[in-house]
Structure formats: C-alpha cells, structure tokens
Design a protein with these regions (language model features):
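Periplasmic plug
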Residues: 98-101, 106, 117-118, 134-183
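Outer-membrane beta-barrel translocator/receptor signature
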Residues: 160, 172-175, 186-265, 271-275, ...
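Acidic/polar loop-and-plug regions of large Gram-negative outer-membrane beta-barrel proteins
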Residues: 247-251, 263-270, 274-337, 355-385, ...
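Structural signature of Gram-negative outer-membrane beta-barrels, strongest in the C-terminal barrel
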Residues: 268-272, 385, 404-416, 451-571
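Surface-exposed extracellular loop regions of Gram-negative outer-membrane beta-barrel proteins
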Residues: 287-300, 417-420, 483, 508-553, ...
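Membrane-embedded beta-barrel scaffold of Gram-negative outer-membrane proteins
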Residues: 333-337, 343-349, 353-361, 518, ...
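Conserved C-terminal beta-signal and adjacent last beta-strands/turns
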Residues: 407, 520, 547, 635-744
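Gram-negative outer-membrane beta-barrel transporters
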Residues: 470, 568, 587-673, 717, ...
Length: 744
C-alpha cells in the first residue's frame, strides 16, 4: 500500500498503471510512493513502463502519517475525521483543520478550547472556566447546559448528562485535535450543523520516550506532568504509554480555583503489520472547577450607576458554589487488514461520569434588585452517567477499470443511562457589587426533580470515495434510529420519544499537479429534540443542510497547506416560543449561517512555522415565532475572527535551541442578544512563547528544556461574549507560565 497524491505521497491506495507512470514522471517523491505499490498492480503495466526514466532509488520511511498518529510539525497531511479513513486533507470536500501536538506545545494550551484559538470557523473563548468548554463552530453553539462541547474522542461520541454533566478531556493526553466544519451526521450521527471536534488520544510508541515537566505561573498556578512510552518486548509487539498531570491554580474570579488530576495509560499489541489492538484508558478528577458565572452588561460592558464591576468579581456563594467531576474511560481500537483489499476496524469505549454541581448565578432576565445590587438564584444537581459507544467499520479498496474505490460500511451504537437529582431555583441573597457581603445566610433549595434518561442510538452508514484520473468523489449516506426514554421518578411519569433520520453527503475534488484542489459539497445533519408541543406531540429532529465550495493547496513536500472555503448552512425545526401557549415551544425557527474561511499552515525554510486564519460569519435568524428576532444576528457569534501565529527556531551560534513564538488574535464585534439591542466590542489580543532546548549547545544538558508563555500580553480587559443584557462574560486576563522539562 502506498500514499498517493498527484506528485507526492498522500494516501494509501491502488494506482492504475497509467496513473502510476504519470506520477513517476512527476519526480522522485512520486517514485518513492509508487515503489511501494503492490507488485500485482504494476505487473499489469510492465509493457507501458518500458519508456519510463530510471531514477535513483530513494529510501522510504515505512512510518507514514496516519489519521491517528504523530505529525511532524504543524501541518497535517492525513486525517480520519472527514471520512473515517486515512484520507489526505486535500481530498476531503469539506472544511477540515488539524491542530497538531507541535502546535499545542508551542502555544502551551491548557484546554481543548485553547487549542482552537488559531483555527478558522471556531470560537472557543465565549466564556472562561473549565466546567463546560463551549465551542461555536460556523456560528452554531450554546451556553450553560446547552453548550456544544468538543464531543468526539477517537471517533466516538462522549457522554452528556441530563443537564450539567459533560465530559472534558485534558489536552495533555491528546496527539491531535481534528476540526471538521459543517454537517457531519453522515458519519457520526446526531451533531451540530456547525461541525464536530474530534480529539485523538496519545498512543504507545515504538521508540522509548520519557518526559517529566514542572510548570508554575501567575494566580498560584502549579503543575506536574509526565509522559512515558515505549516497547515492552524486544520484538516490539507490545508497547505502552502512560501520561498525565496534576494541576492547581486560582481562577480569574475571587474564591474560584481549578484543580485537576488525570492519568491515561494505554497498551498496544501489534503481532504483525496487519493487526493492531490498542487499549485506551483514562481517569480524570476535577475536584474543584471554576464555574464562571455571568454578569450583567450594565456595569461591565456599559457604565453603570454603581460603577464598573471588576474582572475578579465573584457573583456566586463561596460557601456553596462547586463543580466536582469524576470521569473514567476504558475502551479499545482494533484494526485488522485481511489483504490489500479488505480491512476491518472496531472502536469501543465505556465512560462513567459523575458530576456534583452547586451554583448561584445572576438572574439574567432581571439582574438587579436595585442599582448595583445583583438579583441572584441558586440551584444544585447530582448527575451520574454510564455511557457505551461502539463503531464497527469495514473498508474495501477495489479497482473497477480506471476507477479506484475506497468503500466504507459501518454500524455504530450508543447507549447511556443518565440520572439526575436536582433542586429547582431557590432565592439567593442579593449581592452589592460595590461592597459584596459573602457571609449572608442562604437556604439550599430542596429536591425538586429526579430524572432518569436512557438514550439509545443505532446508525448504519455507507461511503464511497471514488478516484478517477484527477477527480475524487465522496458519496455517503446514513440511516439513524434514536430512542430516548425519560423517567420522572418523583411523579412516576415516563415519556418515550423515537426518531429516525437519513443524512447524506456528496462532494467532488479536482487534483491539479500544482497542488491546488478545488472542491464542492452538499451535506445534511440532524439533532434530536426532546420534549413535546402543547398538545403532547413529540418534537421532530432539528435538521440542517449545507452547500460548501473551496480550494485547498498542498505543496509537494507537504510542508505548506492553505485553504479557502465559502459555505451556507440552513438549520430548520428550531424550537421557538409557542405564541398561544408561552410555557411551551413550537418548531417554527430557522437559522442561517453563511461565511468564508481562510487558513494557511506552513514551514517556511527550515526554521519558521506560520499559522494564519480568518473567518467571516453572518449568522442570522430567518424564522421565529417572535417577529422581533427575525432577520437579527445570533448572539455571541463574532462577525470576524482573525489570527496569526509565528514560531522561529533561532540558528545563531550560542543561541541554537532557542525558539521564539508569538501570535495575534482578533475577535470581532458580536451582538449581545438575539434582538440586537447592544454590541460586544471587538478586541485584539497578543500571545508570546519562548522555549530553549538547553542540550543543543551543551551536550551535558541534553534533554533539558525551559519555556515561558504569555497569553493576553497587554492584559486587555474585554467581554468575550453576551447572550442577553443580564448575561455577559469577561474574557481571560493576562496569563503567564514558566516550565522546565526533561526528556530522555
């Protein structure tokens, strides 16, 4: 099997004799790829090869890039997120970006949301705090319990509880983060029309590597991390990896802190080149996580009669607020190739998630009881989730005349049991923003609901990647059945909701020898909607469709990649308030998101890394039961996002091993509510990074590295987003970290 693309190695697959000869004539890189093609394929074209020029043999490293393995540098060549097969990014007819481990290390990211700051189409800074990593993709997102989180890990969905329980993965355990923008239900089932974030776990390596790192920073940040990996047997059939960290830090708001302990052991058994079984496990405990409460626009975004509310102001109850998360996962990834045609994969994961939540928050509908005095409420919830996700795949690579087919058939299943015991909203004592009194007595509200929710989802899908000459066509369809049973244990009631949806995608890419690849696609998605109308009829799924067109570029050496895309997404059956029965909803809403995305990732020369991105978004409400919001922009979605990251490896004598990096992020203006009564101003932020590999100049210090990172260098005070006049979030202030590590 070889990696194939016009003029360069790019994907495993068959070559027709004529196509192979054309690639050989393109140069040595193509010759190296073609040399690895199964002999039976080339045997068909021996006669045609007589006139081919003889080139100097080139050694080829058998460790080609895959969609789940390490990436050399900041530009990935292959991804599984867009097709569930190892496919070059230039052959995927949809917006797709990959955040590599090298980029995460350069920027010292502390959350998956942090890793997306330099990615087009993504806005992950809508609120601070490590409870829920709310991510907006192509204008679609949410807040609080409705937040859209990075929801895929190793191609499998992560669990979501009834309300506040959500899985969060620490980026230190990840090899890469793939962002597929636009509807992805054809492969992954129910999903936001904005796209998915698929996180890929670190896996055992064939070569031994060991890392210990210590980090400190402002706000009393302290962290210890480790990463050990390597073979367990001399023949390399067994390999292990254990990575993790322990961290504590004060959060930006008073009385808030973040604590985390995570460990992720994994084990790989590879008896031969055709079979691989990897056991993936992890345990994460967030004993105290900052629940960053919202504040009113008056006093933060706009001057208030009581003055400015400081960024460190805590609107909650110090003796009550808490978010304690325990998360344990065990699963495996199995892959076996029977022959050059047939391959099977099976991915399975079980997740147990416990969340204890206590929180006091500002009543965003009526934030003040008097000038400068906040109106608050409090609630609590105890949630437990047991979740199983399974994905079976059969892949076949066949030739039909001059046409190559990569056919993927799959069956996925997801089952969860989520329970929640929770209060209603109780009254919390008012809080004066000028002289806050956190010692006021309060009453914890009693138990108000006990819910057990059991969702089951079964999906079958079929995809064909068709390669004919310079064309690559991707066709796929999926049928999914979803059933959710909700039991009200307090009142003895039960509700059952069953849904069925078909989604599909069609796309085409044309591959030029120059490396340019224009593409176009159409795709659909769906999301189940729980609940009923006033008359008791269950809601139907929310559905969306997208049209997208763009151009990608990949240089022959795979060190430079660029893309531009234009898209138009329409989401229908969105819940809106029933005008005849205000305490119920109807499905009369429609949201449209149009935009343009640009991205460039390049290694210029031998020492300079460049990551650039730009996003233009026009996300508006096209239909709603409330005429006041029709035609208005969706809250918290910036119209413009732009970023530039540079990292340079110094070559001066005496400073070799020094890397200097820096980035600029522009977050454009957004609206503060869905009726566009006020705006959230734009802001420009600057980040810096320094690292020094001490062993480059001094052999005695081999393996030692020191680094420093600064986010929001000029300590800008800004609002990251608002969802109403009573709900706004301050953006993160200046963050400084320094670390020292030893690798051997």
């Amino acid at each position: 099997m070889v990696q194939r693309h016009v003029g360069r190695c790019a994907r495993p697959g068959f070559l027709s004799p004529r196509a192979a000869l054309r690639r050989i004539r393109n140069g040595a890189a193509a010759f190296a790829c073609a040399a690895a093609t199964p002999a039976i394929v080339f045997a068909q074209g021996v006669a045609d090869a007589a006139d081919a020029p003889l080139l100097k043999p080139i050694a080829v490293d058998g460790r080609r890039e895959t969609g789940i393995g390490p990436i050399d540098g900041i530009a990935a060549e292959v991804s599984r997120a867009g097709t569930k097969t190892d496919t070059p990014l230039v052959e995927v007819p949809q917006g797709l970006s990959v955040v590599t481990r090298a980029q995460m290390d350069q920027q010292d990211v502390h959350s998956v949301g942090d890793s997306l700051r330099y990615t087009p189409g993504a806005y992950a800074d809508s609120r601070i705090g490590g409870v829920l990593e709310s991510v907006f993709l192509r204008g679609f997102g949410g807040f609080a319990a409705a937040a859209i989180n990075p929801q895929m890990l190793d191609g499998l969905p992560l669990p979501k509880g009834v309300n506040w329980a959500a899985s969060v993965v620490d980026p230190s355990t990840l090899e890469r983060v793939d962002v597929l923008r636009g509807p992805a239900s054809v492969l992954y089932g129910q999903a936001s029309p904005g796209g998915i974030v698929d996180m890929v776990s670190k896996r055992p390596t064939r070569d031994a590597q060991r890392l210990l790192a210590v980090q400190a920073g402002n706000r009393d940040r302290a962290q210890v991390a480790f990463d050990f990996s390597g073979p367990l047997t001399q023949d390399g059939q067994w390999a292990y990896r254990v990575d993790g960290l322990a961290r504590r830090a004060d959060a930006q708001a008073d009385f808030s802190k973040q604590q985390r302990v995570v460990i992720a052991p994994s084990l790989t058994w590879q008896p031969n080149a055709d079979t691989r079984f990897t056991l993936l496990t992890s345990y994460q405990r967030d004993p105290y996580n900052s629940f960053a409460g919202w504040l009113p626009a008056l006093g933060t975004l706009r001057p208030g009669p009581a003055g400015q509310i400081p960024t460190h102001f805590f609107p909650g109850l110090p003796d009550f607020d808490a978010y304690d998360r325990k998360q344990a996962m065990i699963g495996y990834a199995f892959e076996h190739r029977f022959n050059p045609t047939w391959k099977v994969r099976q991915n399975l994961r079980y997740t147990h998630l416990d969340v204890d939540f206590n929180g006091a928050a500002v009543n965003f509908n009526a934030p003040f009881v008097a000038p400068g005095v906040l109106n608050r409420s409090l609630s609590w919830a105890r949630e437990h989730v047991n979740h199983v996700a399974l994905d079976n795949q059969v892949e076949a690579r066949v030739l039909t005349g001059p046409v190559e087919h990569t056919v993927l058939a799959g069956l996925s299943y997801e089952h969860a049991v989520a329970t929640m015991s929770a209060s209603g909203f109780g009254a919390a004592p008012p809080l004066d923003t000028r002289q806050p009194d956190y010692g006021q007595p309060f009453a914890v509200p009693p138990l108000a609901q006990q819910t057990r929710q059991t969702p089951d989802r079964l999906g079958v899908y079929l995809q064909d990647q068709i390669r004919w000459d310079r064309w690559v066509f991707t066709l796929g369809g999926r049928e999914e059945w979803a059933r959710t049973v909700t039991d009200d244990r307090l009142n003895g009631a039960s509700a059952r909701q069953s849904e069925r949806a078909f989604t599909w995608r069609a796309g085409a890419v044309y591959l030029f020898d120059s490396g340019f690849a224009p593409y176009a696609s159409y795709s659909t998605s769906f999301e189940p909607t729980l609940g009923t109308r006033f008359g008791g009829q269950p809601f139907t799924p929310t559905k969306a469709e997208q049209v997208e067109a763009g151009v990608r570029y990949q240089s022959p050496d795979q060190r430079q990649m660029a893309s531009i895309a234009a898209f138009d997404i329409r989401q229908r059956n969105v819940l809106t308030v029933d005008p005849a029965h205000p305490f119920f909803n109807v499905q009369s809403g429609e949201v449209r998101s149009r935009g343009i995305e640009l991205e460039a990732r390049a290694r210029l020369g031998k020492r300079l890394d460049v990551i650039a991105a730009y996003t233009y978004l026009d996300t508006t409400v096209r239909a709603d039961s409330n005429p006041a919001v029709v035609g208005k922009r969706v809250a918290a979605v910036p119209r413009h996002l732009a970023s530039l990251w540079l990292n340079y490896d110094v070559a001066w004598q005496g400073l070799r091993g020094l890397s200097v990096g820096g980035g600029v992020r522009y977050i454009g203006r957004s609206v503060g509510d869905n009726v566009d009564t006020f705006d959230v101003p734009a802001v420009t932020l600057v980040d810096l990074a320094l690292s020094y590999d001490l062993g480059v100049e001094r052999a005695v210090l081999k393996g030692w590295r020191v680094a420093a990172h600064v986010n929001n260098l000029f300590d800008r005070t800004y609002m990251s987003s608002c969802f109403s006049a009573g709900g706004c979030f301050y953006g993160p202030r200046l963050s400084v970290t320094g670390d020292i590590s030893y690798r051997w």
